[in-house]
Structure formats: C-alpha cells, structure tokens
Amino acid sequence: MAQAPVADIFAGKYSVGQQVTVKGWVRTRRDSKAGLSFVALHDGSCFDPIQVIALNTLNNYADIQRLTTSCSIIATGVLKESQGQGQSLEIEADEIEIVGWVENPDTYPMAPKRHSLEYLREHAHLRPRTNVIGAVTRVRNCLSQAIHRFFHENGYCWVSTPILTASDTEGAGEMFRVSTLDMMNVPTTEQGQVDFSQDFFGKETFLTVSGQLNGETYATAMSKIYTFGPTFRAENSNTSRHLAEFWMIEPEVAFADLSDIAQLSEDLLKYVFKAVLAERADDMAFFAQRINKDAITRLEKVIEQDFVRMDYTDAIEILQNCGKKFEFPVSWGVDLSSEHERYLAEEHVGAPIIMQNYPKDIKAFYMRINDDNKTVAAMDVLAPGIGEIIGGSQREERLDVFDRRLAEMGLDQEDYSWYRDLRRYGTVPHSGFGLGFERLVAYVTGMQNVRDVIAFPRTPGNANY
C-alpha cells in the first residue's frame, strides 16, 4: 500500500474507516495496562505526529514494547477518530513493521527532552529530528517555494549564476580562493608571486560573494531576472547574523530605478509572509508559543503596513536628535549599525523602513551616483525586530561615471571589462537587490541565530559534515 503522508491525513485527504499506511520515526511510546501501546509516529510532513495504537494481539507486540525515540517503523491500519485529547485522528494498527532500531537508546544524542540550540548545532546531522529544526526546515521550504512562485507569477526568468568566479562583486576582498595548485610546491612568477596561470582556470579564482554582476548581464537582455543560490564570504565574523556560506535572492530589472526596486522588495516580502502564514500555520503556531510570541503578529503587521521611505540624511538627523544613547555614535557618513536600524524601525516609525540614498563612500562601486555627487541611489529594507533584511540599488549605467568610480576605488578596469561592456552596448537604467535567505528565515521564525536556520552552518573554524 502506498504511503499516506501524515500531513495529508490531518488535512482530510483520507476518510475515517479507510486503511492507510504510514512510514516514519517514533517520537514517543506509551504502554497501557489495558494491553495496548500508543506510538507517536512522525514523518516530517507536518508538525504533529500521528498516534498509532498497537494492540497486544499483534504478532510482534513484544518488539513494539521495546520501541524508543527515532526507531523507524511502517504501520498499516484503519484510520479512526481519536477518543483521546491532543489529536483528532489515530490509526489502529493491523501491522507494524520495525525497520530500524536505535542502537543504545541511553546514549542517543536526540533523547526526548528539550535541548539547547547550541547543543543541537553540535549534532547538526541529527537535529532535523527535533521539533524546532523540523519546523524551521518546513518554513524554509515554504519560503523558498513562495519566492520562486512570486517571481514566476510576475514574469521573471530564473538565472543560475556561477559559483566559481574571478570577480569581486562587493570590492571588499573577503573571498574564498579556489585552487588546485600543490600547496607544498606553489609555482611562482619571477617577481615571487603565486603563478595562477598554472592553476586550473589559468587565473586567480574565488567562490562567489554575489550573483549580481552576472545577473545584470541577463537582465540587460531578458528584462527581468532573479538568482537564488549559495554565496560565500570569508569574513571572520562570529555573530548571530553572519555565515560564511549562505543563500541569496537577487532580482535584477532593466528600465527600473530605485523607486521601482524598493516597491518590488515590499511586494516580495508581503507575498512570502502571506504564504507562510497560510501554508505553515502549525509550524508558525509553534514558533509563536516556544520561540517568539510575536512571530505571527509581526508578520501580519508587515503585511498590513505600507513601508516607510526615508532618506539616510534624514535618518541621521533623527538619530542625533532622539535623545537616545547608542553604543556606536552617529554622524553623516557612517554606516548605520543594527541598533540604529532597529531604533528607527521599531521605536521611531513602528513599521518597515526603506532607507535610501546613502553616502557613496560606504557603498559599492556599481551603485548609481546621485546628482549631489555625495550619495548613491542605494536602499536597505529595515524590518522591526531584526534591522536590515534587504540591500539594493540602482546600478550605474553611465560608462564615464562608472569608470571614474572604479578609479576612485582603486579597481582595475580590465578586471571588469565584460561588466563595462553592458554600459558600452545598449546601456539601460537597471536596478536590483539582495535578500539574505537565512536572515529572512530567521525573521519569520523568530530564531535568534542564522546558524539555526540552515542545514549545516559554515562559520569560522567550523566546516563539519
């Protein structure tokens, strides 16, 4: 008999009295003096397990009484309305096949108790079996599907940009080098530098920090594209907001200015928040109960509110005059820290903010210079409860201005010759943004650390599994 997902059973896709087969892992087992056992089976398809009733008339009932957490079983039986509290349906088993035992349950790392998130990170290969990481995984999947659906419905083309690259999109130099050279016998040039001409690609190559530059090449032909893939930053940052490997969503739109891309960011966030509240109500209820009591209400507020547009210069004035003492002093020309962003979004406005027009000296080389020659057409979306969640800009499409910007930042034109071609052959105003997927998942779930919303976190000193 085909497997019946537990989620489908609870969704009413199977009728009471129908015989079903469920496959999964034991969460708990409770034995009754009346000669039966109650087995909570979980298959990952939804938050709740389904109760399987095993009568002592089953041939292998003695083995069933030995079941412990995470033993794998296949149970076939009749679906019934539950007489007990806490569940609406249960299965009275005609047969229970024990597929896999847990070796030495006393030392099993995921024993049925509440573990700290730090402990779970140390057992990342087993933590999907817990309520919290299982719920995170389903919400992450829901958000991913909703993002693809949003762009598909709005006429965007999904482009897979390269992971291996010779370009530094951010111009910050915090990149992972990729090489097949023998580290014990590195070839050198006459000047004593590493001779990358003998490397696999014949030049110095890195893991990508962003798909943006490659995405722009397709936006200037396909009009509207987006990328959704892994990116890498060699930042030695041990914080709750940073990962060395993470996923980014990066739309690029031709004939779009900063206002257009700001509206796109608002539309995207509202769309995916609506989707997760509708499709993962069980998991979101868990997060509201156990992780952050505002997990649901703050998403609802974002959906209902208009995002507030604010200029960076105005924000600095607000911060300087608010009377609040910040850890990091505020002045025009400094990058806003998380405490500044959260004050503005949570206390001053009480709604998401789209911060615009930042000083050019704190932003990347590809952002369009404004007429004041001091600021760039850049924007960040600041969300209450987390701060920056999206960063984007109108791209500099004027070749002469772009070349001056490269020179100002000490970047070599030759390294960006193909990128300059976009400005030489049919240049067009275009804009885009980057949305860090893990930060989005953390915001939605209320999880405080991005290491807990990605399967196997990569951080300084940690590349396990």
From Swiss-Prot:
**Cellular location(s):** Cytoplasm
Subunit notes for this chain? Homodimer.
Pfam families assigned:
tRNA-synt_2 (PF00152), tRNA_anti-codon (PF01336)
Q: Which organism is it from?
A: Pseudoalteromonas atlantica (strain T6c / ATCC BAA-1087)
Q: Which UniProt keywords apply?
A: Aminoacyl-tRNA synthetase, ATP-binding, Cytoplasm, Ligase, Nucleotide-binding, Protein biosynthesis
Q: Which residues form a coiled coil?
A: none
Q: What class of enzyme is it?
A: ligase
So what does this thing catalyse?
tRNA(Asn) + L-asparagine + ATP = L-asparaginyl-tRNA(Asn) + AMP + diphosphate + H(+)
Asked whether the UniProt record includes Transferase among its keywords, one would answer no
Task: State the InterPro entries in the record.
Answer: Aa-tRNA-synt_II, aa-tRNA-synth_II, aa-tRNA-synth_II/BPL/LPL, Asn-tRNA-ligase, Asp/Asn-tRNA-synth_IIb, NA-bd_OB-fold, NA-bd_OB_tRNA
Q: Which GO cellular component term is one of those annotated?
A: cytoplasm
An example GO BP is: asparaginyl-tRNA aminoacylation
Q: What is this protein called?
A: Asparagine--tRNA ligase
What top-level branch of life does the organism fall under?
A: Bacteria
